[in-house]
Curated annotation (Swiss-Prot):
Single Gene Ontology MF annotation: RNA nuclease activity
Lineage, opening ranks: Bacteria, Pseudomonadati, Pseudomonadota, Gammaproteobacteria, Pseudomonadales
Name this protein carries in UniProt: 6-hydroxy-3-succinoylpyridine 3-monooxygenase HspA
Reaction(s) this enzyme catalyzes, per UniProt: 4-(6-hydroxypyridin-3-yl)-4-oxobutanoate + 2 NADH + O2 + 2 H(+) = 2,5-dihydroxypyridine + succinate semialdehyde + 2 NAD(+) + H2O
Domain NYN: 14-210
Gene source species: Pseudomonas putida (strain DSM 28022 / S16)
Note: The catalytic efficiency of HspA is lower than that of HspB.
Keyword NAD: yes
Record-listed E.C. numbers: 1.14.13.163
Keyword NAD: yes
Gene: hspA
InterPro entries to which the protein is assigned, alphabetical: NYN, Xre/MbcA/ParS-like_toxin-bd
Length: 312
């Protein structure tokens, strides 16, 4: 017997653990300039089925203000892996706010950097008890409040009747007690999305046992399809960091050759965003996401420059 689709959509809000999402899906990929709203609205949520306590299929609708609560923390320059990490993260946060004003709310915790004493593993006897190992002083970097903020916000929105359907994007078991309380005190449906772009990290059982549904990965095709525009317009345009492209070093080589020809960096990027008949109709800006594609663009530019030098 076919289950009946209830006519009243579930008011849905998404809660994203930004730290967990970055390390699970985005680190080391060309997809960091990610547009979160269409990723969930057009890809993730349409792929799942939500049922109520009676087994009826329920439609959903994203709340408008906000649709997504994104929990993050500003990178500290002294521990950043790259020289532009701080400015690149700031650009991304600005882009989300500008493009989706009101629909994505950024809620910030902070990073704490402290010196602490730790025991090091004995290389000659890795199984030696920690109490017998040598002690050294080391830096400890911790993100603070993001998981607590997510748990509190999800519970608050549920207990105050703001949502019917809470989608939790994390694989952090610290969130599990909040989900348990939501299940115990409300009828809110809970979904858990594990932020990993591969299928090699399974969902934590302590987390998903409180979920009504789960999705255990986000594939690279979905991430690629949901990239922000390269330039977000405004009084001061927000531009995708060049280090966030798939092949930043090759991109720089391309720009070094293209800028003198086109006259400016902006003009060079404008050329790269147009389909190129000499590159099988593909756009150079998309080709530079892979080493093979970027090499094709470089070869074309070198060939074009050589031809120009041979002209009388």
């Amino acid at each position: 017997m076919q289950r009946k689709l209830d006519s009243e959509p579930l008011r849905t809000r998404i809660y994203i653990d930004g730290y967990n999402f970055y390390y699970g899906c985005l680190r080391g990929t060309p997809y960091k300039w990610l547009d979160l709203l269409p990723l969930f609205e057009k890809h993730i949520l349409p792929s799942i089925l939500v049922t109520d306590n009676h087994g009826q299929i329920r439609a959903w609708r994203l709340l408008e203000s906000p649709s997504i609560k994104y929990f993050t923390a500003k990178i500290i320059e002294s521990v950043a892996r790259a020289g532009d990490s701080v400015s690149s993260q700031a650009r991304y946060h600005t882009a989300l706010r500008k493009l989706h004003d009101g629909r994505i709310e950024l809620i910030e915790g902070y990073y704490a950097v402290n010196k602490m004493k730790v025991k090091i593993v004995d290389p000659e006897n890795p199984d030696k008890a920690p109490r017998e190992c040598r002690e050294i002083q080391a830096w400890k970097v911790e993100e603070k409040q993001s998981d607590v903020n997510l748990a509190l916000q999800a519970y608050h929105d549920s207990i105050t009747g703001q949502v019917d359907h809470a989608v939790i994007v994390t694989n952090d078991t610290d969130i599990a007690p909040a989900l348990q309380m939501i299940r115990a005190h409300t009828d809110v449906r809970i979904g858990v999305v594990v932020p990993t772009s591969g299928q090699n990290r399974s969902a934590n059982t302590d987390l998903i046992k409180f979920a009504h549904w789960k999705r255990e990965h986000i594939n690279s095709g979905e991430l690629a399809a949901c990239q922000l525009p390269r330039v977000i317009p405004g009084r001061k345009p927000t531009i995708k960091p060049e280090s966030w492209y798939g092949q930043p070093e090759l991109l720089q080589e391309i720009l070094d050759l293209a800028i003198p020809v086109r006259g400016s960096r902006a003009a060079a990027f404008k050329w790269m965003e147009q389909p190129n008949q000499f590159l099988s109709g593909e756009r150079p800006i998309e080709l530079v996401e892979t080493a093979e594609g970027a090499t094709r663009v470089l070869q074309y530019i070198h060939s074009w420059i050589a031809q120009q030098e041979e002209l009388p």
